[in-house]
């Protein structure tokens, strides 16, 4: 069905949107849809009406698919346009319900806003492509788009004048330092320049700086200098752990003049408590005698002899890292460090008291053992005394009346315990 076209139909935009005429809502007996009331020259189910744009004189050009003639709507706005400080392009879709709902006009279906967007800097080509795509749809809708000249937006939203990423991320070596002392300083190290953007990536690849950071203890050193070790002083707990695992935690090595082999063997100032006490190990099983004069000690292992010789030489190779006290034996240093750390790994089995040394716990345990022995001896003596007094026969003259039984005790005394029946 061809639509009737009118050359120009004056429509007031303010009255069309804000004010609704009195005859806008038909009565109960009205049989025509509201679209005919608004657009009397347009048939029901008409073709798609497309508003391609707004001209400079405020005319809206309407194209009809079946009729090649153009239908222009002229409107005059009652509200003055505010001066625009920033060009804005609006694009939206307004669909008018063309189906007759029956009794009256559907107030909710007057204007169905399907989509609306406020786009900044949209060229006219995008608006025309949007309107052409809307024209191919089957439902009668009305597409409107307003655009502004693109030249007004170019000076506001113009991209930066960068041609490639290499110009954005420039090599800092191209700009040498202009300070007056730059000539006296050594040349800066040569950093590998990043790869260009022509390798296939938009941004340059991150250069590899692994060669600039050597391992620890060699950082910030020139190539002509030799690396030096970085020793770390062990903590007291690590020293105890080294002794437990059999490691060496000796202090700095003494010079060759102060080595144990060159130290004189002095006699022991404090003699043994029991010098004539025989050893439990036979002599043939102790092949390492003490070389000191006047010392008849023999040992079954060489490390025991080495430890014994330190008594004669006074060599103390084990030093405490906290108080710098020296010890001749590693176990003595281990127990000494526990006085600083407060560690007490040895607990008493009887009272639970803790000690830092095993010999202290052993000495404390002997106290409990002696107390236990005295208690056991007292208990045994009491039992012997009770057994001795209970089995001793008493004569009638030695019997004393019972204070608890009183007069009844005479009856029990008259009974002969040896009598039967």
UniProtKB/Swiss-Prot annotation:
- Location (main, coarse): nucleus
Q: Recite the UniProt keywords alphabetically.
A: Activator, DNA-binding, Metal-binding, Nucleus, Repeat, Transcription, Transcription regulation, Zinc, Zinc-finger
Matches recorded under InterPro entries: EGR_N, Znf_C2H2_sf, Znf_C2H2_type
Cellular component GO terms, alphabetical: nucleus
**Localization in the cell:** Nucleus
Residue ranges annotated as compositionally biased, kind Polar residues, are: 236-247
Q: Which BP terms from GO are recorded?
A: regulation of transcription by RNA polymerase II
Family affiliation: Belongs to the EGR C2H2-type zinc-finger protein family.
Q: What is this protein called?
A: Early growth response protein 2
Instruction: Name its species.
Output: Xenopus laevis (African clawed frog)
The gene name reads: egr2
């Amino acid at each position: 069905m061809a639509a009737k076209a009118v050359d120009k139909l004056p429509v007031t935009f303010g009255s069309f949107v804000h004010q609704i005429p009195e005859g806008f809502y038909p009565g109960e007996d009205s049989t025509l849809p509201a679209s005919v009331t608004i657009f009397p020259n347009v048939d029901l189910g008409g073709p798609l009406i497309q508003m391609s744009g707004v001209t400079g004189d405020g005319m809206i050009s309407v194209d009809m698919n079946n009729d090649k003639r153009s239908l222009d709507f002229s409107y005059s706005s009652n509200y003055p346009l505010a001066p625009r400080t920033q060009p804005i392009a609006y694009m939206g879709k307004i669909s008018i319900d063309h189906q007759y709902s029956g009794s009256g006009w559907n107030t909710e279906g007057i204007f169905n806003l399907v989509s609306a967007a406020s786009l900044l800097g949209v060229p006219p080509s995008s608006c025309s492509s949007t309107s052409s795509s809307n024209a191919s749809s089957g439902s009668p809708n009305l597409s409107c788009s307003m655009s502004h000249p693109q030249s007004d937006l170019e000076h506001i939203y113009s991209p930066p004048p960068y041609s490639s990423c290499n110009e954005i991320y420039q090599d800092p070596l191209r700009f040498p330092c202009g300070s007056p002392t730059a000539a006296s300083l050594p040349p800066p190290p040569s950093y590998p320049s990043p790869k260009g953007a022509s390798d296939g990536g938009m941004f340059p690849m991150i250069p590899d700086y692994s060669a600039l950071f050597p391992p620890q203890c060699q950082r910030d050193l020139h190539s002509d200098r030799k690396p030096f070790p970085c020793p770390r002083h062990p903590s007291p707990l690590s020293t105890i752990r080294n002794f437990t695992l059999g490691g060496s935690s000796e202090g700095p090595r003494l010079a060759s003049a102060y080595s144990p082999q060159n130290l004189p063997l002095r006699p022991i100032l404090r003699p043994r408590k029991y010098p004539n006490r025989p050893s439990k190990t036979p002599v043939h099983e102790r092949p390492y005698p003490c070389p000191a004069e006047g010392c008849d000690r023999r040992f079954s292992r060489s490390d025991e002899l080495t430890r014994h010789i330190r008594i004669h030489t006074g060599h103390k190779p084990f030093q405490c890292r906290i108080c710098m006290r020296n010890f001749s034996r590693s176990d003595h240093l281990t127990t000494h460090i526990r006085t600083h750390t407060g560690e007490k790994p040895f607990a008493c089995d009887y009272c639970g008291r803790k000690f830092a040394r095993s010999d202290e716990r052993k000495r404390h345990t002997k106290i409990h053992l002696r107390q236990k022995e005295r208690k056991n001896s007292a208990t045994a003596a009491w039992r012997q005394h009770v057994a001795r007094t209970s089995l001793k026969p008493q004569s009638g003259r030695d019997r004393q009346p019972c204070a608890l039984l009183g007069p009844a005790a005479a009856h029990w005394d008259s009974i002969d315990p040896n009598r039967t029946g």
